[in-house]
Amino acid sequence: MSFFALGVNHQTASVELREQVAFNAERLKDLLAQQRNHAHLNDMVVVSTCNRTEVYAMTEHADILLNWLAQTNGIDIKQLLHHVYRYEDAQAVTHLMRVASGLDSLMLGEPQILGQVKSALALSKESHTVSRDLNRIFEYAFYAAKRVRSETAVGSHAVSMGYAVAQLALQVFSNPEKLTVMMVAAGEMNTLVAKHLAEMGVAKVIICNRSRERAESLAQEIAHQVEVEIIGFDQLAANLHRADVVSSCTGSLHQVIFYQDVKAALKKRRYNQMLLVDLAVPRDIDSKVETLDGVYLYGVDDLQSVIDENLAQRRQAAVEAEVMVSQLASQLLTHQKIQQAGSTIQMYREFSQQQSQDEIARALTDLNKGHDAEDVLKQFAHRLTQKMMHPTSILLREAAQHESPDYFEWMKEQLTDVFEHQRKPKNNLDR
């Protein structure tokens, strides 16, 4: 039984193909329930996000993973063949750890993927398609991800506009829980900014947008995390003083936040500082506001330079993280081999005990029949030795024929050491 990882991601497949093989949680739960009694594919976890769909499974038949992925999505296998990647055992473990740590993500070091992998495991557990061995691999991958994030800087620098704005707010204001944020426009960029700020724990988000419908759509996305208020675009200047942080991205050809408006807002705020972030091109905010005391103005170029520098730092940290993942994967595989050896040793011990019991019973029967005790004892020892040596002798001969010479020489040395140790005379002084 081997551990396999098979799938497609943003590096190997177009968005169109990724859409074809994607699963939502409800459909995936039904499919996993169907796999529960499958002879060769009943121990599996499926990770499906916008950037990847991957199947992780314990199985003896790797091709069945590709067949399953194609058939469940109605895709010709030939269409998938040129885009899927497949890893086995050590490589599969390393890949899973890299995925969980954010090292294989489109946005290097992004933290969301760990939660998505955890959710995938939880769904498979609910469907009873996760063995103890498969669960152990995933739990160790989560441990690796935690180590990577806590011991390297791979996730500590902002590399998206939304995240950068949130981090900037933390630098300017020490306590995000007291902040009121104003989103001027409710487009895609400001939606990302609003989500990051809401997750950071700001007190309130004011959405200022021309279309109330679009503002309400954004409000619904963050209302479970933060208090939300919607105002019309004509109310922007009158409410500017209420905002500690303003993020503007309108797409307008003209400025929408003027010097005099910000100056008046500062006065109403008793000159408490304001952070203004202009994500628009052309710019939304009059650049002269930067001359006002207490105003921090950042534009797209300012943020992009920070993001570029941070991404370079993440890439540097990723080198250290890759080494850590490789070491942790090796530790897990070593642990698994030791466990497998322990199971084999236990089986061999039980086999030996059974052979001993059989021969003892036979010897006692012979003694009860009046056979010579010395002959019975010699026959007992001979038969037991033959039974114990037969399977190991066969394995040693096969190893000599098929295993690498180095491995066979190592095994001979180990056995020789054991035999020499057993031949040493006992110290009778301790009796």
Curated annotation (Swiss-Prot):
The keyword NADP applies. The record marks 95 as: Important for activity. The active site is at residue 50. Its EC number is 1.2.1.70. NADP(+) binds at residues 185-190. It catalyses: (S)-4-amino-5-oxopentanoate + tRNA(Glu) + NADP(+) = L-glutamyl-tRNA(Glu) + NADPH + H(+). One of its GO terms (molecular function) is glutamyl-tRNA reductase activity. Pathway: Porphyrin-containing compound metabolism; protoporphyrin-IX biosynthesis; 5-aminolevulinate from L-glutamyl-tRNA(Glu): step 1/2. Keywords: NADP, Oxidoreductase, Porphyrin biosynthesis. Gene3D superfamilies: Glutamyl-tRNA reductase, N-terminal domain, NAD(P)-binding Rossmann-like Domain. GO terms for biological process: protoporphyrinogen IX biosynthetic process from glutamate. Substrate binds at residues 49-52, 105, 110-112, 116. Catalyzes the NADPH-dependent reduction of glutamyl-tRNA(Glu) to glutamate 1-semialdehyde (GSA). During catalysis, the active site Cys acts as a nucleophile attacking the alpha-carbonyl group of tRNA-bound glutamate with the formation of a thioester intermediate between enzyme and glutamate, and the concomitant release of tRNA(Glu). The thioester intermediate is finally reduced by direct hydride transfer from NADPH, to form the product GSA. Homodimer. Possesses an unusual extended V-shaped dimeric structure with each monomer consisting of three distinct domains arranged along a curved 'spinal' alpha-helix. The N-terminal catalytic domain specifically recognizes the glutamate moiety of the substrate. The second domain is the NADPH-binding domain, and the third C-terminal domain is responsible for dimerization. Belongs to the glutamyl-tRNA reductase family. This is Glutamyl-tRNA reductase. It comes from Acinetobacter baylyi (strain ATCC 33305 / BD413 / ADP1). The gene is hemA.
